[in-house]
Amino acid sequence: MLITSILGPVLTAQFATKLPLPKTREDEENRNIESTLDEWLPQLKNEIKNDHFTVLIPIYNPYTQRDLIEMGALLAKKESGIIVPVSIAAAHVHMDDPQVDGNLKQSQILLDRAIEISQEFEVSAQPIIRIDDDAAQGISRSAKEKNANLIIMGWSENTGLKARLFGTILDTVFWSSHCPVAVMRLLDHPVNLRRILVPIKNLSQATLETIKFAQLFADSNQGIITLLHICDRQTPQEQITEFKTTLSKLITEYELSKECKIKMIIHDSPSQVIIRASHQFDLVVLRSFRRRTAGGLAVSDITTEVLKKIELFFSFIWTTSFMILS
């Protein structure tokens, strides 16, 4: 017993890092990366087969709607697509209630402004007003009805009791939507966001989709993408080199981005690295993995930790815009 307790930690520290990692479900998805990339990437290149690339943008805050419309217009224009501004007017038991008419009038004002902004970017807009007793479901249903390729929403800082008990509109849209959802908090106009940071954990289909989305925005805005991969201190050097080589080959072979840099950092706290590195960029694109559980939507641990720190820094030192792609 004494010998085991003494030698155990020593042997573990020396040999544990050399042992093969157990195969998890995520590993199964990422194995044979060279062969599966050939299957994934053609799908990514041809995934948009609608008549128009459609970006649905819920409008509810007149102070933030310009940046959201501007972002959607940049992406839609790059793909020769359209934007669909949608305003959800709260329903009422009696549809002849004056409050319903007031809600519809306010929605129309917001949509008229959205059309004006879209015209500045020479992008077609198809605004809709939806009467619904659930704003989140109204957004998800509108996106499905319009066969939207992307939903763009603003970041919500609602942390009240109701939000903690029942979740926010963002939580519900993330959980129920059929297409990717981009949630953003922009501290500058989208046309000024050119230095883009994309933290990546591994080479998976989700990673490729995130890079493709960042590329779409970078191409529409003459931006430069930096892919950031953080390794812990126990990662063998040959594994780090192999990852960087494979990623470089992926970028070159499939032309994921013409202006793309790779940065590898060894550190035990990925969230701290992302926070520190973000100050050198205009926009950080984070990935949220949709895992539908009985308790709702679960996001990746690193993204959650970064968001907690972002919330902490918002009021005084946070100076970088960010986007979460689900």
Segments (PLM) and residue ranges:
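A short, acidic, amphipathic alpha-helical segment used as a generic capping/interface helix at domain edges
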Residues: T245-K249, I266-S278, A294, V299
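Short acidic active-site motifs
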Residues: A135-I139, I169, S269-I274, I302
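Non-catalytic interaction/regulatory modules that flank or connect domains
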Residues: T54-V93, V100-D101, K105-R113
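Acidic, proline/glycine-rich short linear motifs
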Residues: S87-I109, H229-K249
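Transmembrane helix-bundle signature of multi-pass membrane transporters/permeases
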Residues: M1-S5
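Intrinsically disordered or low-complexity boundary/linker segments at protein termini
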Residues: I6, L11-Q65, S87-H92, N149-Q239, ...
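Active-site charged/polar residues at nucleotide-handling catalytic sites that mediate phosphoryl
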Residues: K146, A277-Q280
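Short helix-loop-beta junction
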Residues: A76, R113-V123, L216-N221, S248-E259
